[in-house]
Amino acid sequence: KIKGINVKIEEGDIFESTDWKLIPFNEFFDTTVDDVVIARNSLNGKFIERLQDIDDLKRQINEAEDVPRMKRKIKAGKICYPLGRIVVYQDYLLLAFSHFENNQAKLSHNDYEICLRAMWNEISRVYANKPIAIPLLGGGITRITDKNEFNLLRCILCTLKTSNAPIYQPITIVLTRETIDKINLYDIKKIF
């Protein structure tokens, strides 16, 4: 438990969860899966390729209302969302997670923490008292400075612990077998 919230870390496929499923996007909520803008093997790419109606997804993103302190702006001629912003789509929470420049998703460690702190507030705003499943954010192809799986997981849990966001449902962090093999979960449990 972290701040009274049941937090579980488990191996699995996030798409099989019946909870809210958090999916990271870049700051533009791009939807082009072409192995340049979005890689097919990324969680983002797999999510988009599962959809029947990408136009519906784009419409929902474009029609999402601005949120105080999370207003959209124009960057490089495109609508850009602040890191941490969540747009709800079906049973998914779509997260503006990374900057996108020169066809690369990038995030400094400082921006990673800022994004996570904003994300917990956004989850609190939209989760409607339903449990949440999240992946190991930053564990994929996003270029994060100084990343390793243990530190990413610790940072996710630390920002939850220090967040003031009222969340009253369980959170499951869904990891791949490959990722679980790289993390000493006993050390994580000792910290929290």
Task: List each language-model region with its residue ranges.
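Macrodomain-like recognition of ADP-ribose-binding/processing modules
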Residues: 1-192
